């Protein structure tokens, strides 16, 4: 008897399903992957598709066979002498292939799992990563990531130019073309520029001053002079589906002394990571080295005045078909391997100064890392 992986989802939202099939569809479909003997990326891949999608799947999907859902449903109906459910159709396929053991992702439907167990199948939830090979990127994937990154850098440059060309008002707010320069306006510019480059941005962060002390505050309202403005931009390419992630922090006017010191410390934190990252290194060691550097410079982390301040998030994360993927570069142990693409995004956040974060993307190599990001890191604009 064989063991197979089973996915029932839409590949527009399910990155594992898109990774395995390279077929994009907005409605759920059935995918069965009979693994190779060594558990690698090989094996036999089968799609079970509706009449609506079967011909497109045959021409676009990177699988071994595409079967008709309607035909399997007809066979199941004859066997059961009743209208079949989706799980009856799955059973029809698996029984014909002598498959009785199934691996499913942790977010697989409980109702589907129960129905399969009632039909005598062994169903095991496979912990993430469902496809571990997703963590190490191919040359094609790195090219896709870089393509999205270049588009993001161009959009970010347009946003920074707007801030640079704005005028400082007596109340320290910024105006451009006679209108207030707001977080919403910069976000709109970023999204429009990315759309022109076939990228889609969501939850883009444009946070100024105290708002930026909360790293995931998307930001709102007027942008102000002499305060750090954090822009964290992470779109997905509409065609390739691969993400990019970049953060830059700028100040219009003159940055206070503490902000300058924070900026320099964060840049040095990145340099520490670049010197340490290579094949076989534990990401937690990289994270600790940056924390130690911040502490040595007097930038302490912990709860202060009722809120977290300092450096209280991870140094980085993998990305690809999802914005956050394994591995993590954080306090958790994760061994980095050549071919992984991770972000390097240390930050410092204090209520009396605002937030500073700088983020690049790097490829882990045998002896170090290759920085993919090319955008300049300039505080004063």
Predicted regions and their residues:
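Active-site neighborhoods and metal-handling regions in enzymes and metal-associated proteins
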Residues: 1-381
């Amino acid at each position: 008897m064989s063991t197979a992986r089973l996915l029932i989802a839409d590949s527009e939202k399910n990155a594992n399903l898109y990774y395995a099939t390279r077929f994009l569809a907005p409605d759920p479909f059935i995918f069965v992957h009979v693994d190779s003997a060594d558990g690698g990326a090989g094996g036999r891949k089968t799609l079970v598709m509706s009449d609506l999608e079967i011909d497109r799947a045959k021409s676009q999907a990177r699988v071994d066979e595409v079967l008709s859902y309607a035909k399997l449903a007809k066979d199941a109906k004859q066997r059961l002498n009743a209208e079949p459910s989706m799980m009856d159709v799955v059973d029809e396929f698996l029984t014909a292939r002598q498959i009785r053991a199934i691996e499913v992702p942790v977010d697989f439907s409980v109702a589907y799992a129960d129905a399969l167990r009632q039909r005598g199948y062994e169903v095991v939830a496979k912990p993430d990563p469902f496809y571990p090979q997703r963590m190490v990127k191919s040359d094609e994937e790195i090219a896709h990531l870089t393509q999205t990154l270049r588009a993001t850098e161009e959009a970010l440059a347009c946003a920074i130019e707007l801030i640079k060309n704005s005028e400082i008002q007596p109340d320290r707010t910024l105006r451009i073309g006679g209108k207030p320069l707001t977080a919403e306006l910069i976000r709109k510019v970023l999204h429009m520029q990315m759309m022109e480059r076939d990228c889609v941005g969501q939850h883009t962060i444009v946070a100024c001053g105290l708002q930026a002390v909360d790293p995931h505050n998307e930001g709102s309202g007027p942008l102000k002079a002499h305060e750090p403005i954090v822009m964290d931009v992470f779109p997905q390419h509409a065609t390739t589906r691969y993400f990019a992630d970049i953060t830059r922090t700028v100040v219009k006017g003159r940055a206070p002394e503490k902000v300058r010191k924070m900026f320099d410390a964060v840049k040095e934190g990145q340099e520490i990571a670049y010197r340490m990252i290579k094949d076989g290194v534990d990401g937690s060691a990289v994270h600790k080295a940056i924390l130690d550097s911040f502490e040595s410079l007097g930038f302490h982390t912990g709860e202060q005045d009722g809120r977290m301040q300092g450096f209280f998030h991870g140094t980085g994360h993998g990305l690809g078909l999802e914005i956050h993927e394994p591995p993590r570069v954080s306090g958790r142990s994760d061994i980095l391997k050549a071919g992984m693409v991770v972000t390097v995004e240390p930050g410092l956040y204090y209520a009396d100064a605002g937030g500073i974060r700088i983020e690049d993307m790097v490829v882990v190599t045998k002896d170090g890392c290759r920085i993919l990001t090319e955008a300049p890191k300039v505080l004063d604009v």
